[in-house]
């Protein structure tokens, strides 16, 4: 684990947290607020007490994605294509199934789950491209 790994892990963690804020805190805020009264979702005030868990989760996401991506770099292929491939693979293996599982065990509206899957897949593709840009296959850092 070199310096690039640590820098990349931190940057991807921050990017993941920011993308999730855009997706869940801004774009889906209205959908979530409609579920607060039923007790399915926490109110924004209650959710703020759990921010340390969100930070910890995004650190795990950032460093986990960095570790996996760096193990599978193919130096013979364009970086952005590799990043998109990686982001798509993670979305198919973890992001989309995670929301399908939540839908099966929680009474969430189907429209919300579709939005979550689409927006989170786009976020994962962006994280894949960021990983590709930060890890161009050379040892500059």
Model-derived features with residue positions:
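Juxtamembrane/disordered regions of integral membrane proteins
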Residues: 1-141
């Amino acid at each position: 684990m070199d310096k690039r790994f640590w820098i990349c892990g931190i940057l991807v963690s921050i990017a993941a947290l920011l993308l999730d804020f855009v997706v869940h805190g801004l774009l889906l805020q209205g959908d979530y607020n409609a579920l607060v009264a039923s007790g399915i979702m926490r109110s924004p005030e209650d959710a703020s007490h759990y921010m340390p868990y969100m930070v910890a989760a995004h650190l795990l996401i950032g460093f986990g994605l960095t570790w996996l991506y760096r193990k599978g770099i193919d130096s013979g292929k364009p970086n952005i294509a590799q990043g998109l491939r990686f982001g798509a693979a993670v979305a198919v293996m973890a992001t989309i199934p995670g929301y399908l599982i939540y839908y099966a065990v929680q009474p969430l509206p189907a429209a919300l789950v579709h939005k979550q899957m689409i927006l989170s897949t786009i976020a994962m593709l962006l994280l894949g491209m960021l990983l590709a840009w930060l890890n161009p296959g050379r040892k500059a850092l």
